[in-house]
């Protein structure tokens, strides 16, 4: 197979990865040759009973009864039957023969081998090959062997001696899990101490089994891929099958003699390790096992092709594989072992120790799709291919594989008696996502936001063979990946608990990153500013501040964000969705932490308290600045643009100053009124204001209207006839965004929060009292500025003259003294001012003059009206003499006729 590469020169895609060390290769031959380096040559020496520690070479003419057997291994070996092959092509052809064996062949009962005397009739002790220490159980021996593995990780493999467990260390430079060996005690076959023959020794050596499949979740080892796949299914939630007809009472309660023999627990513990030596004879009779050492499964219906089930004699629990039954029986005999960090349960202390090593290991490579962390980049690259819609090796059942060998072994599980292949991929059911119920508005508790389902994802069908998430429109190649994505991303399942503070998380990697907050460990420094972080994800988000990249952009206003979660929260503003309401003042927020920060202003007690004085602060930065200035007597680092103080230069470099952004040159110009703004988002918001005000109004160039006129002005949509066209010929006007209108003064606002703050002007509400003097304010920022009057803090200093101010706005007004800028001009007389407050005071003089002029005009008008009445009465006297006045008969009235 030739190496396939992309059209680009810089990137070459490797299609094959080694399952042991995760190295990437471009052809199958290279990875097969490389995998041969992971299989060490193993020497099995059969030692006599009298002196098990002595090794004697075999001689053809000797009659001592000691033998030495050497197992040779070829370059290419079938992992299923152990046959040796000479080339990769022969290995592939041989594996295809296994695929064609769809129907299981009936095993021909072999002749019973000659009786082999036991190796030892006494109790077996487990001996360590390094320090010669003896142990009474496998668990104690395994725990002891872990100390040697951690001390000497690159030790060369030692010879395996029958009768004593041996641990083979990994080769130098290979990051592999050590392959452990253990042996089961041989059964007593009869009396006598005859030395086994060469044929018997050879047959015993051929019974050594290699367990090549290791579970990544619990580190258990398996020989057959079917047992490995069945075990892996226990770690993932399987779909609930339809209700089947219950078995008859006879099948459930009356087991057959064969079933009773199978359901009994083994007298010896099952081996979990890579090699297992079994004596197949018991008192001259073969045990009920096949040629590979597997127990025969019990059929629930009596037919060979039916579903096979195994029952536990202690609790009547049903299992689908002998390995599951053996693990369950071990839990009855030895109990279970629980992890103190993640509450997972393991059947043996060795698997628990290996799992605890996963908690302490570092994972530097994070998958951006599912959040899983990996120790090497090769593992991450191999994992990333599972997220692609068209993986390298895809099975019709929905599973994908990167390694061709594992894919071929998986295909055999769909043979006769296995899992049938689906004719068409079954689309996943709509996930039942549960969110916490929102609290009533009057309780003041947090209300959970409802995530809107995208109309595009529901209307647009997914590609054939893929599964699409209905909430975020992402596509997956397997239903299992979609289920995992919905569980970790959209569902609020938090099953992993921190053992220190009790906080719950969705993934174990999140717990590991969270534990570093307790230990203070920050192993991921930024290469630009050297700031350390406790997780690679936080480091990746931080590096966006240096590059200036904002990959997540809002489609409504064009504003860009560094995180997708921030964009989702921002879109709630456009949707006018504010689910979090304050019980005290009724202000609503679209983020829960903003409501939490808002509540501190009502209580007056802030979360960050100083240990040396009774003061408290809303932000940790303010507390650090306070401790630096007041208690340490040092000057903080200040931003030259806005004057904000920071405890360190690193925090100052991270600061993104809004004042500096406002002083930057404005490059975006409005096509309607010519106004220039500093960003595309502000330009779109400004153009939206034009659309809300109507096409006939100009916002920026016309002088500001009087306050009464601005308060009563409302946008009026012009009719088609007023624009000079007919209703049929005029094009459809674009949908305009209407702002939020105040019911009292008809003033328009762009956000709900601005409207809520404005309404306090009409209601007179001031929900933010000062804890020092009791003065109340309408906004929390006004209270924060006011409290500096009590503390005497003036954090905003002028860089020209050194004068300090308590409010940043006062500093901005003061800078105009040095620059001579007067941006606020009066529309009536043209006089300009440095601050808006001075302009407002000046406008009051015009209003007073205008009111005085109006009063004078009214007085003059009243005087003119009175004079005109008097003059009219004098001139009418001659006319009154000619008027006849006579009484009415029906009513007391006067009728004048001339």
Curated annotation (Swiss-Prot):
It is found in: Nucleus. It comes from Rattus norvegicus (Rat). GO terms for cellular component: nucleus. The modification Phosphoserine is found at residues 164, 301, 719. Keywords: DNA-binding, Metal-binding, Methylation, Nucleus, Phosphoprotein, Repeat, Transcription, Transcription regulation, Zinc, Zinc-finger. The lineage of its organism: Eukaryota, Metazoa, Chordata, Craniata, Vertebrata. Residues 707-734 have a biased composition (Low complexity). This is Zinc finger protein 574. Gene3D superfamilies: Classic Zinc Finger. A zinc finger (C2H2-type) spans 16-38, 76-98, 126-148, 213-235, 310-332, 337-359, 365-387, 393-414, 467-490, 496-518, 524-546, 552-574, 580-602, 608-631, 637-660, 668-690, 740-762, 768-790, 796-818, 824-846. Pfam families: zf-C2H2, zf-C2H2_6, zf-met. It comes from the Eukaryota. GO terms for molecular function: DNA binding; zinc ion binding. PANTHER family: C2H2-TYPE DOMAIN-CONTAINING PROTEIN (PTHR24379:SF121), KRAB AND ZINC FINGER DOMAIN-CONTAINING (PTHR24379). Belongs to the krueppel C2H2-type zinc-finger protein family. InterPro entries: Znf_C2H2_sf, Znf_C2H2_type. Residues 273-290 have a biased composition (Basic and acidic residues). May be involved in transcriptional regulation. The modification Phosphothreonine is found at residue 726. The keyword tRNA processing does not apply. Residues 243-305, 417-460, 691-735 are annotated as: Disordered. The modification Asymmetric dimethylarginine is found at residue 834. The keyword Electron transport does not apply. GO terms for biological process: regulation of transcription by RNA polymerase II.
